[in-house]
């Protein structure tokens, strides 16, 4: 039987301090890299389905992992130190990040490995086969899972040009180059999240250069023989913080402090967009801003605001900095004054579900005038005075966690009676989401 969450009442005004779960992208990268280090790494990671999939894959590759209290102890045997048998199958669950980064550790695998995922992941593009082929790896059925991969003993460094701003493809190339290829690997790509670069530079001490050009970055990494184990407390995820942030912003007479969040410039695109929509420091502000191991960490203060302005998002905006938050941004635009336009977002339809289409569908459902722009954009006629009073049903059968949480925020902030299917999908990134909503005073069943 499909599970459903019910929301029948707006959230009351609140004034709270909360924490959000650890950064999912950073948690997966830390776990994967710890498996290649020499010695035992001690990591405080996100506890979610995607991280469990990551750790289960590493265990099947022969990595010893123990959890003690809130910390994972991952015992690496060095680069290419995996120990596994032939005909191995690795289940990536729902994690596109894991699917695309794990193969970078397997470039020298002597055996064929099969990578699979759940129903949603099996429809998503694999993407990293082409750069890994240049390193020397072999693939069959390399478009969507299941993917079959075999490594090579003769890995060569590459120069890879990437037209889209994809932190995952960039990371896959950087890890494969640093850990397996002698010489210098270069990645030339549009700017994207620098999570991996910060780990290399500030935590693992892997030599690299970042050359910033007008429209792209050129990143160079030199192949290494080994690196030491490390300790890391992963900070809060901006993508998770976005939900209570928007809930507070769109609710009435509420204030919230979200503590210990990763606010690296390439992660805070939603705040950059909200600034352009008139959200000043009075309504969203960073407090206790500091830099820890290359990442900017802050407590985010947010309070309710009822006069958002429409936005025409420029082509120059780095969409990758808000790629997981655009459905929330569309919801904010729906309650702003004026006509908002968002373009060049075709990447949204390559996520767990077609999120650009979902954004259009949700806004039409609640009575917002909305128009599609080709296959890449959306135009939204905002209505600040709209009150939601009808019954709404979200049949989230592809189990997209961000659709479930975005529509929950919409119902809690602006009313209506909501039935949202497949709430278990939330466990992918934010297992404590419903608990957090209840702590803020929301009625969600």
Language-model region placement:
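Structural preference for solvent-exposed beta-strand-turn elements
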Residues: 1-445
């Amino acid at each position: 039987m499909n599970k459903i969450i019910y929301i029948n009442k707006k959230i009351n005004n609140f004034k709270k301090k909360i924490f959000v779960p650890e950064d999912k992208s950073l948690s997966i990268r830390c776990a994967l890299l710890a498996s290649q280090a020499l010695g035992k790494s001690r990591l405080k990671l996100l506890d979610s389905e995607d991280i469990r999939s990551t750790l289960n894959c590493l265990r099947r590759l022969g990595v010893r992992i123990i959890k003690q209290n809130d910390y994972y102890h991952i015992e690496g045997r060095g680069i290419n130190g995996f120990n596994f048998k032939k005909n191995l199958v690795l289940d990536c669950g729902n994690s596109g990040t894991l699917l695309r980064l794990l193969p970078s550790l397997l470039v020298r695998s002597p055996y064929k490995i099969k990578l699979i995922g759940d129903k949603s992941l099996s429809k998503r593009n694999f993407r990293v086969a082409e750069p890994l082929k240049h390193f020397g790896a072999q693939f069959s059925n390399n478009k969507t899972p299941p993917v079959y991969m075999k490594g090579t003993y003769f890995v060569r460094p590459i120069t890879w040009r990437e037209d889209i701003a994809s932190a995952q493809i960039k990371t896959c190339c950087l890890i494969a180059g640093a850990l397996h290829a002698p010489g210098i690997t270069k990645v030339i790509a549009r700017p994207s999240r620098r999570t991996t670069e910060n780990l290399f530079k500030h935590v693992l001490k892997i030599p690299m250069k970042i050359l910033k050009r007008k429209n792209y970055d050129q990143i160079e990494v030199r192949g290494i023989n080994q690196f030491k184990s490390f300790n890391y407390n992963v900070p809060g995820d901006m993508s998770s913080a976005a939900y209570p942030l928007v809930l507070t912003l769109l609710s009435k007479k509420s204030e919230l402090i979200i503590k210990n969040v990763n606010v690296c410039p390439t992660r805070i695109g939603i705040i950059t967009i909200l600034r352009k929509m008139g959200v000043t420091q009075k309504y969203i502000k960073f407090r206790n801003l500091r830099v820890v191991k290359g990442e900017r960490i802050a407590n985010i203060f947010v309070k309710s605001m009822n006069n958002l302005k429409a936005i025409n998002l420029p082509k120059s905006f780095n969409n990758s900095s808000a790629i997981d938050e655009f459905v929330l941004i569309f919801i904010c635009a729906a309650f702003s004054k004026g006509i908002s336009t968002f373009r060049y977002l075709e990447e949204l339809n390559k996520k767990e579900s077609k999120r650009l289409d979902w954004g259009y569908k949700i806004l039409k459902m609640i009575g917002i005038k909305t128009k599609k722009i080709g296959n890449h954009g959306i135009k939204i006629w905002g209505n600040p005075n709209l009150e939601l009073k009808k019954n709404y049903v979200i049949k989230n059968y592809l189990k997209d966690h961000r659709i479930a949480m975005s529509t929950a925020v919409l119902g809690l902030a602006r009313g209506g009676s909501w039935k949202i299917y497949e709430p278990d999908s939330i466990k992918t990134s934010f297992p404590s989401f419903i608990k957090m909503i209840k702590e803020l005073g929301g009625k969600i069943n």
